[in-house]
Amino acid sequence: MLLKVQHVRKEFQNRTHALTDASFSVSQGDFVSVIGPSGAGKTTLFRILNGSLRCDGGAILVNGVHFESADRRTRRAIQTTIGTIYQDFALVENATCRQNVLNACLPDMAFLPAVCGFFGKERVAEADALLDRVGLADKVHEPVKNLSGGQKQRVAIARALMRHPALLLADEPVASLDPVTGRQILELLRDIQQDQKLTVLMNSHNLELSQEFSSRLIGLNQGTVVLDAPADTPAKEILAAVYHRQEDQP
């Protein structure tokens, strides 16, 4: 099992319980979506999984290794196997597409203005190949600030792949995009996932897209996993279990 989340809890200083009992597992090669209403704990969960936030209890195992209780070196080693793409892209706007992709190779994503000169030709060629894979071969030297939202997310995907991740966290990857562009991004993500047998865990508010592109759904509500089911589970059952409402009738 690539990822195991076992009874994970997180409470903030204002005593808000963001996660009260989150437990699920993800197998190698799965495309799993985490769904739920706003405030369900999805973003907190993803921040814990990418290492930017510590949980208050429970355990997270990546390839059998306890992530939370590991020493600093082991945590860093685990984090290098996890790539993340974000709703807001998290790119360096004034840098080129190539520079942003190469940025993934730097410690803690620290940016070097002369980053392309910092790496050898092989790394630069790999970055360019990834930009080609996501459909941006003609944008290698283009500053990110000149790109559309969909193109920026393609750069972000290439950057995440530069880490050769075993697990890709997609945190609301199409929430800021129009429906057509969002679907194109998810189609690209699914193609890459299937080609590379990559494991994808996606946080999404869009049930329809989650069902279409995922193999499994994890439903969160009030910090607790209330659903773990195949993606083709009838929508009315998902709505009742996760959102506590019935499917709207025409």
State what each model feature region is:
Residues N50:
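Helix-to-loop junction immediately C-terminal to a conserved catalytic motif
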Residues P113-D138:
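Conserved ABC ATPase "signature" region
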Residues A59-A77:
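ABC ATPase NBD Q-loop/coupling interface
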